Amino acid sequence: PASPSSRLYTYDGLYDVVNVHFDNGAAGFGVYQFTLIRRPGQPQLGLSIVQFVGNLKKKGLARPNLLLEDISQGQENWPVCVVNEVDGDPAPTNFTYIPNIKYPKWFSHVLPQGCDCEGGCSDETNCSCVSKNGGELPYNEKGYIIRDKKVVYECGSSCRCSSNCSNRVSQKGLRYQLEVFKTKNRGWGVRSVNPIQPGGFICEYTGELLSDAEAEQRVENDEYLFELGNNCNLESTDGGLQLKNMSTTMISSMNEDIGYTIDAKCMGNVARFINHSCSPNLFAQNVLYDSDDLRFPHVMLFAMENIPPMRELTYDYNYTVGQVLDASGNIKSKACYCGASDCKGRLY
């Protein structure tokens, strides 16, 4: 869970003690004081990154190596800039930015039955949305998801509660200032200028909604295809956000002849640039607010741990090795370069 003090603590590397001495501290008591030297070859100091970000905001400094001020073209709550500090590649603009899912002509939402709450919903009220969520609100008072669920039911347009209801979180768009940046060996990635606490909402995975039959005709786009109900976190846990070893299982009601997929190859948002990791810091969560149809959940990405500024955001693509095929039915293979200590070596 998030820290009650709202302070963000981050791991900052390994240090060797090179000297120790006993002296009087500021309060007049004797204390041991240590001289530390940081071991070489580790990532940049978290403190220096925080100071860099603070200077950008405080002094209004221009973002170094900026390629594009806002790839969303004003469609998000924050500008999503593009930065390349690695090579001479231009900004990736070969797609149409859409902040919401692009539905096909045949699709129509069946509005859910909304709650009758006035003002905001709470666990203590006789709220139908609270009942859908197992008798508790999925978010705390600061808008952080409390625990992973099979499905989170947010209040929507059918509900009488206000737009400021604490059960309306992911539908409001970006909460953090994200930027697209060029990685050294994995193409483009995404990071946040702001610190993120566990349970913080990052973004929705948007794109074109396709039937699985249509998606199979776009096998060349496999790294942009997100199968609804298959990659999301569908098994709830009892330990809150202890999600590092989270398993994924299909909801039985989704096991139908017709499945659906989101394709972000030609249309998508900042989520299309978020890379895979075998040890991710984000997880995918099914969310419903404009329908109760489990076949068409919104795929929302949330933080599963404290994430300091400028650290790459990642989630587990959840591919099964040997199950990704090309147009001819041959098994495809791709190496994984996530760099995690428990990296599986192959993305698929």
What are these regions (language model features)?
Residues P4-D16:
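Short coil-to-beta-strand transition motifs
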Residues Y15-G25, R218-Q242, N330-Y348:
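Short peripheral tails and domain-boundary helices/loops at the edges of structured domains
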Residues H21-G46:
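Short solvent-exposed strand/turn elements
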Residues I37-R39, L45-N140:
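Intrinsically disordered, low-complexity acidic/polar tracts
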Residues T96-R175, S328-Y348:
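Cys/His-rich Zn2+-coordinating "finger/knuckle" modules used by eukaryotic regulatory proteins
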Residues R168-S291, R295, E305:
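Catalytic cores of histone-lysine modification enzymes
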Residues N194-P195, F296-D316:
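Acidic/histidine-enriched ion/cofactor-binding microenvironments in catalytic or ligand-binding pockets
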